[in-house]
């Protein structure tokens, strides 16, 4: 059900419920944003990502509910497409999902989690996707798997996008048109904050230097490689340039700062993240620096670890200007979460984060 209600007052809580036949839904709660010229006293929001059903229960949501947020931002990997595996905390229904019915069933299964249900009930959500809502590490119309025909992959993308729209709180303007779905958009909270919600999957070129972890060399510097696509990048720059908000928040998926997963002598970086699209990353950071965009903050999910990063104009120069801040949040349940996956990367950070608590990030 997608309801777009008009005529509501700004900056207030509303309660609602649905009737169909003899059935009545639980009472939901949502909040309207302040008018654009108003400076609200505060905005309290949470962001999350990466909730793998089989890896654990979604226990972060009850903590969010206790903190009474104005907004929840989900940065992607709301579901995972993989087949069910035995001897996990709980098991996906069926094989790897490909059909529209498969995707619908997977969303329905995830929505049986009580914590997730309740968080949707008590606060508005601002959502975007990453890769697992469709297929791991895909880029536009390119599968990470060999031997998948373009026709088969396109049909699967149509199914994945349709199911995502059906289950997410999205307006009619995001209604899919076949394999295409416009998800990038802006959301204003008065003059305090402007959210620029991005899509780093649908329009990106294929990973220019291949997938996985590799040095920053060769095709990483491809001038034609793009993370956002030409149209979305132009839209983002136009909105950043026109913004008069105190904070400009980029809600997106993959880590923007470089994370060395190798050694100091032989550094390796994820080619699926922004370092794999170095020209695209530099162009965006340079634009924000030259136009003096007010207080850029990048929200990131994807890698199941907490990081706080300075976004420098040139990451190879320690004295390079700092353009903004990146906040990388750990997973809701997916593997890692500051555990065994940390061993190889602690040395690349000035500060390591050990986990999360109901009060925030533990340093």
Where are these predicted regions, by residue range?
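Metal-dependent phosphoester/phosphodiester hydrolase catalytic core
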Residues: 1-363
